[in-house]
Swiss-Prot record:
Keyword annotations: Signal
Family to which this protein belongs: Belongs to the cytochrome b562 family.
A Pfam family matched in the record: Cytochrom_B562
Gene Ontology annotations of biological process type: electron transport chain
Gene Ontology MF: a single term: iron ion binding
A GO CC term attached to the entry: periplasmic space
Protein name: Uncharacterized protein PM0670
Signal sequence segment: 1-23
Length: 124
């Protein structure tokens, strides 16, 4: 039951993003933080993959929006590169999950937090 509720909440977050709700970058980053945590706590491959799918959608949308803390094009390009790096790392973790290696996928997903920390120092 707990697993079902968790998946439903993740799905609702994803649907709100996918349906075009106009969220600012800060709200999207908070969503990313919540969903990223579900990756490292996933109980099975299906839960991991659902979270990865939603996180990828949020990250992709966020990469197209300029945060208010970024005031020039060069920094915005750097921010977008960081988001691209984040998405690439997410895809690598998801690939491990697709191969049935949940533990390796969860370990790889921890890299997302490192990437976040590096780019938050630069652009937050």
């Amino acid at each position: 039951m707990h697993k079902l509720l968790k998946l439903l909440s993740i799905t609702l977050i994803g649907l709100s993003v996918a349906t075009g709700v106009q969220a600012n970058v800060r709200a999207e980053m908070n969503q990313m933080k919540t969903v990223a945590a579900t990756l490292t706590n996933a109980k099975d491959v299906a839960e991991f993959q659902e979270s990865a799918k939603i996180l990828r959608e949020i990250a992709q949308q966020s990469s197209e929006k300029r945060p208010s803390s970024i005031t020039n094009d060069a920094d915005f390009k750097g921010y977008q590169e960081g988001m691209k790096e984040f998405i690439t790392a997410l895809d690598e973790a998801d690939k491990l999950a697709q191969e049935g290696n949940l533990d390796a996928a969860k370990t790889a997903a921890k890299k997302l937090f490192d990437i976040r920390n590096v780019y938050h120092k630069k652009y937050k």
